[in-house]
Amino acid sequence: MKAIHVSEADSVTQGQVLISLDGTVVEAATRATESQLIDLLATEARLVAERDGGNTLTLRHGFSVLHDTPQMSSALDLQTSLFRTRQASWKTQSEILDQRIRQLQAQIEGMQRQTAALEDQHSLLDDEIVRFEALVSQGNASVVRVLALKRERARLVGAIQSLGSDIAATQVRIGETRNELIGLSQQRTEQILSHLTETQKNIDVLSEQFNADLDRQKRLVIRAPRSGRVIGVRAHTVGGVIVASDPLMFIVPEGDRL
């Protein structure tokens, strides 16, 4: 017992404090539970924002007694800072992959333009070969010229085919990069959901403990259940221990016969 506020034969009113119990242990346990719960609630708010793609952290309902405390403000500041850092990191990571895809697409467009130019040259060569073959058959041109044109045409065909292979390989790289981006996004989401599930389970456990601690704190103050006169006081020593089954005192309503 921390303090005894009444003596034998005192008159008391309903709700008046009779005895105060030492709450050192209970209050320490409550503060410890409260601190852990605050950290978990702030963490949950961050994870929900990350899961939903939000920009701000919002605390869940049901813990208003903790919402406006300095400890909660500090915890939210910490989690908001972490949220911004993780958000920026993911944005940078995804933008790097997006930029890689854009660069590869630009390479494909360049190769496609080269291919179109080579195909135009190939078409012109076909026409020129036909014309020179006609001249050769008439004896007006050398066959050497025709052979040179055909070698050039073969070179163009090889270049066009090589570009086609390069385009196909680059398209594969684009697909791989897109899959990498999707995989990283899925991995990030799975990690967020796993951490969120674990955090919410811990909140459920600690919330029960916190409510139990608050209930114990309320019972540190023993009040008069009704108005009357105090008799049979058995609690006399500050620092003494109360046994649950032992009465501390009796209160007899005024006017009742003892």
Q: What residues fall within each predicted segment?
A:
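Alpha-helical transmembrane helix bundles of large polytopic membrane transport and channel proteins
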Residues: 49-81, 88
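Acidic, glycine-anchored pre-beta loop/turn
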Residues: 3-16, 37, 137, 236-242
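Short helix C-cap/helix-to-loop transition motifs enriched in small/turn-promoting residues
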Residues: 9-11, 39-57
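Surface-exposed patches in structured soluble domains
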Residues: 216, 223-258
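Conserved strand-loop elements at the edges of beta-sheets that form or border functional pockets
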Residues: 3-6, 23, 222-224, 253
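Long, charged amphipathic alpha-helices with heptad-repeat/coiled-coil character
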Residues: 74-218
